[in-house]
Amino acid sequence: MAEDSSIAATPAPAEGVISKTYHEVTQPFIDLWHAPRALWGVNLAYTIEGLSYFGILTYLAIHFSDFVFKGVEHSDVWSHEMVMVLTAGIAIAMVVLGFVPDKWGVRRALILAFVFLLVGRIIMSAAPTVLGLAPSGIWSPLHLLTMAGILLVVIGYGMYQPAAYAAVRKFTNPKTASMAYAMLYALMNLGSSLAMLAFLLRDDQFLGLGITGTFWVYTGLTLVSLLSTIFILSRKTVAEAIDRAKAETEAMGAAAQEAAAKSGEQKSKDDVATGPRKVPVTAWIILGAILVTAYFRLPEPGNYAGSLIVLLIPVVISLLPARMRNSTIQWIALHPLADPRFFFFIFALMPVQTLFTYNWLVLPQYISRAFAGGWIGEYYEVASNANPILIFILVPVITALTYKAKVYNMMVIGTLVMGASAFILAFGPTPITLLGYIVCMTVGEAMWSARFLQYATEIAPPERAGLYQGVAQLPWFLTKFLVPLLYSGQMMEKYCPADGPKNTESMWLIFGLIAVITPTALWLSRGWMMKGFKVKHEG
């Protein structure tokens, strides 16, 4: 550890920490109060949608396993894969539909997104209630109609998230943009934390709506989001906000910034023209991983067809005309994933990022089953949704306490704290261990998540920082896809079934062993990762 003697953060003066923390916690609300009407239109709907999305997500695995797939063998496995369709599907949809706000305008994109979200949630809610569809196995009318609703939600959210951020970008100038983005993040956490109170709607001791009835409440909130967007974000309001932001940006020297951006683009083009023409080893690693996944996870005979397609990719590239082949290889060689340090960094984070997916795939079912018969199990929404409000509070506190710490060191310590949290639940399901897990995981997340994109930016060539930030999100998408596909449903079925003996200690021990791969890998590779870090793109 001699090489990392700077891991411990230099403590800030007490008054400075308190002042900085108070500022970070209260500033989003101050900014919200003074925000222009256009940003109010975005922020209000974003807060409500945070509650609606995460509220439904909390119940979704339980809704499928205990209701839609009632009596079906391996219902936990099937339910987790259905949740995967939503979460991974949204990640894909955002890539595919990200052009909508640019082409049609942010107001139209937001309204259209909420229409899709509303119709999708109406279908999900109406299938077992208004239409009276009963559980009758896999691919039953109830299952198919619920999935149809989810697919509409996927399309809607695929447009909504890019549109919300595009709106903030268009309604702000370079000076106020970071404040507006921070406000969105804070309000999303605030909105999603309100799902803690959903038991007041669901539980028989209160309103007794059940899960399907609570879905209707979230559907109604989606209608509120749609109407608020239509009336607050009027055409006149949007036009005035965009014109004002443009004028402010021009006054701040937008022309100089555009010239710098063009210079960066030209440099990037020059780099491409003279770039390497050798396929990097990282590309072969990715191809091999896709091949293994296709062969072992696709059902026969699809696994053979999928594997063959993967194997044909390099063959097809090699048979392309020389100019096209060279351009393709150059694109691969200059892609951020061709950078071995960046490749290692983002994929090394995947094990600890699996803990994020457990928040909706595992925790609601685990708490309701392992703590059955008590207050915690009955009102599982409280513990399942405690993370967002804790993140809202802890991120500015920990940022203030560790602002002098090195970014990479914070990544190592933060992922270690977060990964180790799973071992707490390996001691058994008790109120103390559950509280310890939630707090420890959230503290760890607050330590490293804020530094993640910062490190991804610093490791990137200056003119390609945005591209590196975008690609850095890839492992997060992969965990949404791979965790339910590979093991989360099987683990619940084996160690925490709805009925029968449970062994949740072993389940969380395995989860912990997976998660701590990240800090172990980051620490063991620290010398290589930091070697030439500050000068790797100079010269």
Regions of interest found by a model, annotated:
Residues 93-106, 203, 393-407:
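Helix-to-loop junctions at the C-terminal end of transmembrane segments
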Residues 178-203, 219-225, 471-487:
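Glycine-rich segments within core transmembrane alpha-helices of 12-TM secondary carriers
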Residues 212-231, 282-287, 306-314, 502-527:
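Symmetry-related core transmembrane helices of the 12-TM Major Facilitator Superfamily/SLC fold
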